[in-house]
Amino acid sequence: GYDGVDKRIDVIATAIKGNLTVRDITNLELAYAPPYSSAKDPVNMAGYVASNILDGLVDVVYYNEIDKLISDGGLLIDVREPMEREMGFIEGSINIPLHEIRERLDEIPKDKELYVSCQVGLRGYLAARILKQHGYNVKNLDGGYKTYSDVYGAPEAAGCAYVDDAGEMHIADHNID
């Protein structure tokens, strides 16, 4: 695993053993050393994410639901930057970068089920909060495009190299418009 994963598993295991709630996890004081971690440890952040879901601040959908939701008429808004989207995207999504959401509200229909996604979930969460505050019924794709593409594989993207399941490298030539 990645550096520090074992320590975070220890913290979560201790929290479980101590009957802590996700709200308790947000308040844990974990040793902070700038060279090794951020001011809010990923364990704290996991607690915040779970608390936000429990408190109804954001509704989520999961990678295995999104394709059907789109095919049933839902609208998926990819809030990543265009350059990120060029590396791959979920079929049927449209791109409105997070920093443009407020200025482009008139382009977003209020009569559709809306879903937002980004790379891993943070910008999607922020977009979902903005849209919800403007009266939209919106859900964030939990784990974002990264989780979706980790499970289903990244589609071919213009000028992007990828490795298939057999370990063969290919250069994608699919045009993304």
Where are these regions (language model features)?
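C-terminal catalytic lobe of FAD-dependent flavoproteins
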Residues: G1-I25
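Rhodanese-like catalytic fold shared by cysteine-dependent sulfurtransferases
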Residues: D24-P34, S38-N64, L69-L75, P82-E113, ...
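A generic structural signal for short
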Residues: G1, Y115-V116
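Fold-independent oxyanion-binding glycine-rich loops
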Residues: G1, V79-R80
